[in-house]
Amino acid sequence: MSERTKWTDEQWEAITGNEKSLLVSAAAGAGKTAVLVERIIRKITDEENPVDIDRLLVVTFTNAAATEMRERIAQAISEKLEENPGSANIQRQLTLLGKACITTIHSFCLEVIRSNFQQINIDPGFRIADETESRLMKLEALDEVFEEQYENENEDFFELLECYGGNRDDRALQDMVLNLYDFIQSSPWPEEWLEKMTESMNIPDGTDFGKTLWGSVLLSSVKIELEGLKEMISRALEILKDASGLEKYRAVYMEDLANVDALLKLLNEESEMQWDRIFNALQGFEFATLPRCGREVDKDKQEIVKKIRDDVKQRIRKFREKVITSVSNEIISDLKALYPKMKCLANLVKQLAEKYAEKKNRKSVVDFNDLEHFCLEILTERKEDGSIIPSRTAISYRERFAEILVDEYQDSNLVQETIINMISKGDDASPGVFMVGDVKQSIYRFRQARPELFLEKYNTYLPDKGSPCRKIILSRNFRSRREVIDAVNFLFKQIMSTGAGELDYTDAEALNFGAVFDENAKEDITVGGEVEFHLIQTEDEDKNFTFENEGEEGRQADEGEEDEEMLDSIQCEARLVGRRILELMKPDENGRYFSVFDKAKNEYRRVEYRDVVILLRTTRNWAEVFVDELSVMGIPVFADTGTGFFKTVEVQVMLSLLQIIDNPLQDIPLLSVLRSPIVGFTTDELAELRLVDKKALLFDALKKLAESGQGEAAGKASAFLENLQKWREMSLYMSTDRLLWQLYNDTGYYSIVGAMPAGEQRQANLRILYERARQFEETSYKGLFNFINFIDKLKSSRGDMGSAKILSENDNVVRIMSIHKSKGLEFPVVIVAGCGKKFNLQDMNKSILLHHELGFGPDVVDHKLRLSWPSVAKQAIREKIKAETLSEEMRILYVALTRAREKLVITGAVKNVRKAVEKWLDSASVQKSRLSAYDMLSGANYLDWIGPALLRHKNCGGLRDCVGSAGFRGLLIDDPSVWSVKIWNKTDVQSSGVSEEQGESEFIKWLDSLEKEEPSEYAEETARRLSWSYPYVKASKVPAKVSVTELKRRYNEVVSEDVMQFPDYMPVLVKKPMFLEEKKGLTYAEKGTILHFVMQHLDYGREDIEAQIEEMVAKDLLTPQQAQSVDAARIRRFLNSPLGKRMLASKSINREVPFNIEIPCHELYRDMEDEACHGETLLLQGVVDCYFEEPDGIVLVDYKTDYVAPGNVETIRERYKVQILYYARALEMLTGKKVKEKYIYLFWDGRILGF
C-alpha cells in the first residue's frame, strides 16, 4: 500500500494542507490523532523544506494525551529512520524530539512564565500550589474579606447579605463569591469582565429592553417556542381535516394560528420599542371559546386537538407571567435597583482576588489559573486606546514556531484561545494554526469550555482548497460496525440542530462507515446485529395512575417516596442489563455464541465480560446499585465512581483515630476506634464502658474503666490509652504522613484490613490516604489539626475522592463508568443505561446565575417582606443556560453512542409506557425530517429524544402500537438502521431474581417444618459418644491445602533455603507497603513480586514497555518507587530471546494462572503411617507464571529474579525441579493437553534452563 492510498481524500487534505488557518472537524472514530501525527511527520521529514520538530507547538488537552502523542511521533520517526537509515535530517529530528513542545496549554504557559518571570515581577523560584493548598488559601482570604466588611459596617455589604446570605449565616454569600471568582477565571481579563457586566445593569432610561443582550435572548427563546406552537396548531388542523363532527373547531384553530403568526411577525420586524409592542400583543392575545359540537363526533380526535390547544394556552400564559412580564421602563427600574448589590458583589470578588494573590506571593506559589493569566500578561500589551496587541515576547514566539497544532480544539476556553492568537495571528510570516476536534463531542462546559469558539470558525471557514481560513470535515468512522453508524445517524439527523445541539447534523456531519470487519464470519457465531432499545415500565400494570404531570402543577411526592421510586427504577434497569449481559455470554437458541472481532489476532472470538461497558450519565446513586445487582447475578463488575473514598470503613476508622489523637474528647470518633479491630471492644464491653459513668465524656469513662483494672475491657482500655498518649506526643513533632505510617505499623490495621473481604482494595485505600497526607505536608499547611480540618472541608464541599484503582485492563470484568470518563475510548459492547434519568438543571435555581456573555442574573429580593422572584435578566440567563445545557446533554449522548464498536444497547425506564409514548407521539407527529428544536429543548431526559425519533422509524411499529398506530401522523422514515425495540414491565424484569415475597414464603415454610426439640433420654449413649477418641489424630494435623512452594521446601531439605537469595513469590500488594518497613528500598522478594505483576499486565502487542509501566503508575497499580525497580531492558531481552519470540508467535498466551489440584497425601508426608494417609488427598495450590500453546502441545515458562552465581546454575535447576514438575502436572490436568517443554527463565542474566 502506498503512502497516499492508506488515507481517505479528506484525511490526506488535512495532512498536506498548507492553509494559514486550518480547522479539521473530525467525527468520532475518524482517526484524528493519526492524521495529526502524520501531518507532523510529513513536515519534519519533508525532503525539500523540512521543519525541525522543536519549531512545532503541539497543544493537547491532557498530560496523558501529550505523552501518547510524543510516543507515537517517536515511533513514526523511528520507522522513517529504518526506511532511510542514512538520513541526517531524520536522525536530527529524533535528537530534537526531547525538547519538542508537545504539551498541554498549562505546561506551555509554565515554560513561558519561567523564561520571562522578570516581566511580571514574580519569584523565579515559584512552585505550583497543590489544589488542597490553593483552596485553603482561598478560604482564608475569603474569611479575611468578610471580617473586614463586618468591621467596617459596610451598608451595601449588609444589604447584599440580607438578600443573598441565607437564613442562619453568611455561608451562602461566601459560596456565591467563591463561585463568581472561579467563574471569571476563564475570562482573559477577569476584573474587566466584572466591571463590564456590573455596569451593564445600569441601563439608561428609555432603552428598549429588547435591544439589550437579555432582551434579545428572551425574544429569540419566545420565537423558537412560538414556531413550536405554530407547528402544534398546524398538527391540530391536520387532524381536524377528517375528524367527523368537529368542523366548527377549524375556524377557532385558524384564528389561533393567525394570532401566533402575528406575534412571530412582530418578532421578525425591526421596530422602535419592540419589546413593549410584543408585551402589549401578548396581553391582548385571546383564545376564543370552542363551539359546541353534536353527539356524533370522533371523541379520540376531539381529545387530541383539545389537549394540543390546552398546551398552547399554557405556553402563552408562561410568556405573559414568566418571560415578557412588563414593559421596558419597569424592567430597567428593577435592574437599576439590583445594580448596587451586584457592584458590591463584584467588589467582594476583587478583594478576594487581591488577598488571595498576596498570600500566593508571600509563599511564592501560583495556581493553574495563574499560569494562563500570567502567560497572557507576558504575551500581551495594551495600546493607549485600550486595545490588546502582541508583546515583543509574543512576537519572538511567532518567530520561533513554524506551526501551532491544537488537539481537542472544541474544549478550549477564551483564555487559551487568546494565548494561541497572540503567538499565531499576524502577517504572512506568522505561524499557521492547525486545529482539530469535534464540536459534537464538546462536553466540558462545566470546566468553562467554549464550543462556540469552534462553531464560529466552523460556520465561517470555507471548504475550498487554498482558502486562508479553511475547514475540512473527516466523517468516515473507522471504529464501529455499520449497524452502530446507521443508528447514530438516524437519531442525530432528527434531534440535533442549531437550536438544540448548536449544530445542524446534516449529511456532511453524519458518520460514514469506514471500519474493516471480517464479514465472512463463521456460521457457528453471531456478530454485530441490530441496535437494541429496551424500555422498562416501573409502575405496576394494575396501578391506578392518579398523576403523571411532573411539572410545577403536578402532585409532589414526598422526598422519601421519590428516593424509593428512583431506587426501584435503577434496580429494575440493572437487572435487565444484567440479564442481557448473561444472554450475550451464553449460546443462543441455535447454539451460536455472540463474538467480537479481535484486532490483535485478526479473528473473531467469543465475547468476554471485559468487552462490555455500561455507560451512565452519572455514577452517583446508580453505579452502586448496578454493582450490587450484577454481582448477585454472578457477573464480575467494577465501577469507577470517583467518589466513596471517605465512606469506606478503613478510611473512616483511620480518620477517626487521627481525630482523637488531635482531640480525644470526641465521643463519635472515639467510639468508632474502640469498636474497630484496633481496640476490639465488643458491644457488651461498650455497654460496660458507658455504665462506668453515664454522664461523662466517653474518654473520661474510658480512663475510669482503665483505672478499675477489672476484666478484659479494662485491659483493652489501659493498653489503648497508653498507645494514644504515645501517638499524641508523636503528633507534636511528626508530620501527618509519618504519623499515619506509624499508626499502620503500631496497630497492624493495614494487615488486618488486608485479610478482610476485598482486602486488596482496602489496603490500596489506606495507601491513598497516606499519599494524600504526604501531599498535604508538602504544602505550606502542615500538622495534624490542619490536615483534619482540610479533610472536613473537603467532605463538606462534596469533594470526595474515588476509591483506589486496583483494576487492570486485562481483568475480565464488566466496567461501569460515566459517559465523560469514556470519552476517547472504545468498547466492543456498549450499554448506555439510565436514559430515563432527568437532566440535572438544578444550577438554574441558584439565587444568582452567571453567564459569560450575559453577566449577572440575580433574583429580585424584598428582604423586608421576605419575598424573592427572578429578575428578567435571570430569566434570560436561565433560558440561555438551559439551551446550552441541553445542547451539551445532546453531545454527551452522541459521545456515549459512538463508543460502541460492535454492539450497542440502549436502556431506560419510565413510570408508564403508554403515557410516555403518547408524549413522544406529540413530538414525532411532524412532516419534517428533523424534529423541532422546541420539542427537543422541552425534553426531560434522553428518552424524550430517542423515543420520538424511533416512533418515526418504519420498522419500529411495536413502539407505535403502544398507543395505536392510527394515532401517529408524523413522517415515517425508511432508514437503513436496524433496531430491536423491546418493552418490559416490572414483573418481567424482577423475575430474573428471587422476589422478596418468595424469600419470605420459603423462610416461613422452613420455620414451620422445624420440630420442637425434646430432651434426650439417652444420657449414657450421649456420654459414650462424647468420650470417643478420633483414631486418625496424626492425620488430622496434615493440612488440607498446601502450596507448591511448601512442596519445594520439603523436597530440598539437603539444601538450606536462603530467603534473601531465593525469595518466595507473593501476590502483588498483599504485603505491607514499603513505607511500613523498617528499612529503605525494596527487598528482593518485593522486586520479584513487582516484576511478576508487570509481566502479568503488560500488553505484549505494544513495544513501549516503559510507557506501559508509567501507565500502571498513573492508575495507582504501582508506586513510582516500585516502577523504578523494574528493568524494562531485561523484559525486552526476554521477549527478544528465542523462547520469548516463540511465546509472542503463539495465538494463546496465558499468564499468572492459578490452580488447585488434588495429590495423594503420602507424596508429601512419606513418614506418615500407611493407615493414616490411606485414601487421603491434599489440595495443592499454586500459580503458573506463564504458558503458551503450540500445535503439538504446551510450553511452560517460569520466571526467576534470583541472583545466580556463575557455578550455581545446576543448583537452581535442582532446587526448582519439583515445583516445575508439579506446575506441568497441574497444567495437563487443567487443559487436557500435554506439556511438551518446561523452562525457567532467569531475568538476572537471561539464561534459559530446560527440564
Curated annotation (Swiss-Prot):
NCBIfam families xrefs: addA_Gpos (TIGR02785)
The EC number(s) this enzyme carries: 3.1.-.-, 5.6.2.4
InterPro entries: AddA, DNA_helicase_UvrD-like_C, DNA_helicase_UvrD/REP, P-loop_NTPase, PDDEXK-like_dom_sf, PDDEXK_AddAB-type, Restrct_endonuc-II-like, UvrD-like_ATP-bd
Signal peptide residues on this chain, from the entry's feature table: none
Primary role: The heterodimer acts as both an ATP-dependent DNA helicase and an ATP-dependent, dual-direction single-stranded exonuclease. Recognizes the chi site generating a DNA molecule suitable for the initiation of homologous recombination. The AddA nuclease domain is required for chi fragment generation; this subunit has the helicase and 3' -> 5' nuclease activities.
Protein name, entry field: ATP-dependent helicase/nuclease subunit A
Segments forming domain UvrD-like helicase ATP-binding: 5-481
BP-aspect Gene Ontology terms: double-strand break repair via homologous recombination
Assembly information from the UniProt record: Heterodimer of AddA and AddB/RexB.
Cofactor: Mg(2+)
Binding site for ATP: A26, A27, A28, G29, A30, G31, K32, T33
Region of interest called Disordered, as start-end residue ranges on this chain: 544-565
Record-stated family: Belongs to the helicase family. AddA subfamily.
